[in-house]
């Protein structure tokens, strides 16, 4: 199409609704190029950035854009930074949606209200650039479609938010000032293919730059590394295409360096190798470099060679130089296993959106490096670019630091009914082909990319089959994966289910999810299985994570998975008081929205880790431990195994300690020298005290590396050798007199001991007062509790207008557990010689149905210790409760807490493998986990002793407990929608639980707490002792 087209014709033509038009005049995509003229030339000599402030005008629909907008006076315009999303700068609104389209779905058509923004800026190029060669502008990310003008001349059009759009400006540039103008539409028919679970935002959100190309230049090049079966001979093939003028006599010189030393080189002319019976490509160079005993790239050892490619004239003058880091490695599926360099991989992966809480899609390099270092420090080795190609710099960093990458096409039609409505329609094949073939062409030279993905949640259509075949013919070096259509269709080389469970089948009318164990055993199924999504970390989650890793280690064809997902997508926003808070769906009055479903990362939006990250790091660690005991059960030795596939232990120091209750008995260090898969047996010294309780082991880096400092802990383990630390439960001999009084004025049983007083209300049977020297300890009575402030996993998919009756929260509410009627069955008191006993029995009912019965014995001894013994029975058929415990509101002004139990971080019964038993001290506020959507949080389990303020609580008869101490009541946590709205209450809320349900986390939309972590018994017993420390 000619460039001479009026603005009105562009508006009327509606390219953004034409299903077969994806671009006008956009240049073919290629691998990243710098077009340098010498080996050490500064990039700024061939690349000019157009990032910065652009003039900006916003319109609610494209038909409102004035015809002369590109010629308007820029001094009267608003300013918009590039890169950015305009919704984060006061225009329009972000929309968070998981599945539903943010507009009426009628492909390829779009609503008239289609927000449109017009960007303009002035730039000036070096006059030398205008004398010869070409000048191209590259927009690396624009959502969702745009038209481009230069100096009033229409240049072209492009779609696909996540891949570069390059245009030739050469003919329309002038000396001096040039005006570039871009009209960006929020929605296009491409938006039907960009229905990912994310904030929907728009704008120019990646770099914009102008590049100067020589008159004759390298148009693209493709690298291919081949290894022989012994992996000691490598061939690197470079296929380069040249474009421009008079290139028939040009030469290509390739040189390969490792650690600044040249290891191979070759010069070549245009290839005469025939492609088919009609002959060779007339613009292709082919070079082959051979290596003996190459250093092989892996995520563990990311060895990179530097390849220098020079385009030369016939006389040897340099026209263009490109430098690129390359990795030599071999990816294959063999014998049912995904292998790298001949060894099976175990994918320790995470999904990752491009997201920044302040900048939206505009993620900068500093944040990318921060993410990669955090991944490496927490034992990740892989990342899935969910669900679109990332910024080009991301792949370079993954090459450098060492991460395996699944590169995913920008295709998701989750909101279509059926899901494959578009992907099965040949009309949309060109659009889909654009997104797949351009991704592969741009990114194929990165060693970190080991798998291509056809997209996400788009059903299974004929177009997928066509694109799968294209990739398999175009790139022989990588497998292809795709989950849509059931995770095991003909267009995936790997079974890639979402949220399949280890042992439980999930039967659906279409595309059932088999258990992992069943899937790999299906008749005729020989492919490896890697979960493309699992372990949904929404809020307080990731319970049962270890079951997956036990299965991964047991069954070779279960080769890991990608956790959902990396970082909470909470956008920083100001509340009515001007304070920052993290917003989720609906906070911008966005419709439709999926509320807090965007808060499902391992990191909070500020990229601080959630407690669940400890569990992930533990199960993904590269060193495995095993304790050996003799027939008498005594620990004699332990082994440590190097679970790396390629990396020898040479920079790791093992440290182990054996601790008794009061001292460190043994403290030793060993510098490890272990080959991959090799184990070391470490014998424990004999003659240890029989009271030695714990064996603590950790492995740390001796020297710092690219992602962690010296001394950084990469693996840990703890074994209980004997009885755990804890109180003896011995009652101190008491001489003080304790008395029981029935106070008719207050209708209480009153126990007095020196200046302490306990009061039990006769009409409620509750401990309603505990004072010392007239200072009250309780603000509210000590009560049974069976519920928790609901987790996201408890709520499931329930909404105000859509209730999921299967969700735990709905079950608990339907059973009346949040509104139980308490009935005192009996209360009696007994004076003993050195103690007072209070016995109570309560029933808890809903609509005359008794759900729980609780019997308690309070023994208050003359030494001031109150022993509480509780027996709870559950009615048949009621929903399993969240907890069996007691709670009260304390008057103490607590600042510090110490306890002996699992810690130091938050842990729950199904998420405590990483927690270690010990004595922990912290501030009260450090017990709180600031989940953006408030819920139950802050638990510490397996506690034998707890001290706070002037209080001490101890386990009784070796039955440990869990506790919470919080400035927020359970009721407030359940009621408030955002953490910034929580109000610290007077005093502190204490929960002491004998039993707690797990948190679950296989997914967040169906009950996922494993049976062994449910409170499914009909009877529970627990006890503890409570006293003041200042008696």
From Swiss-Prot:
Q: Where is the active site?
A: 457, 533
Q: Where does Mg(2+) 2 bind?
A: 593
Entry EC number(s):
3.2.1.23
Which prosthetic group or cofactor does it need?
Mg(2+); Na(+)
Q: Has UniProt tagged this entry with the keyword Metal-binding?
A: yes
Q: Pfam families annotated for this entry? A: Bgal_small_N, Glyco_hydro_2, Glyco_hydro_2_C, Glyco_hydro_2_N, LacZ_4
Please name the GO terms of the biological process aspect recorded for this protein, alphabetically.
lactose catabolic process
Q: How is the cofactor bound?
A: Binds 2 magnesium ions per monomer.
The Gene Ontology terms for molecular function here are: beta-galactosidase activity; carbohydrate binding; magnesium ion binding
Q: What is catalysed by this protein?
A: Hydrolysis of terminal non-reducing beta-D-galactose residues in beta-D-galactosides
Q: Where does Na(+) bind?
A: 197, 597, 600
Per UniProt, Mg(2+) 1 binds at 412, 414, 457
Name the positions where substrate binds.
Answer: 98, 197, 457, 533-536, 600, 1005
Q: Could you tell me the keywords of this UniProt record? A: Glycosidase, Hydrolase, Magnesium, Metal-binding, Sodium
Question: If you read the UniProt record, what top EC class would you report for this enzyme, in one word?
Answer: hydrolase
| Keyword Lyase (UniProt) | no
| Positions bearing the site annotation: Transition state stabilizer | 353, 387
Instruction: Outline the subunit composition.
Output: Homotetramer.
Quote the PANTHER family the UniProt record gives: BETA-GALACTOSIDASE
Family under the similarity heading: Belongs to the glycosyl hydrolase 2 family.
User: Per its UniProt record, what HAMAP family does this chain match?
Assistant: Beta_gal
Q: What is this protein called?
A: Beta-galactosidase
Gene this protein is translated from: lacZ
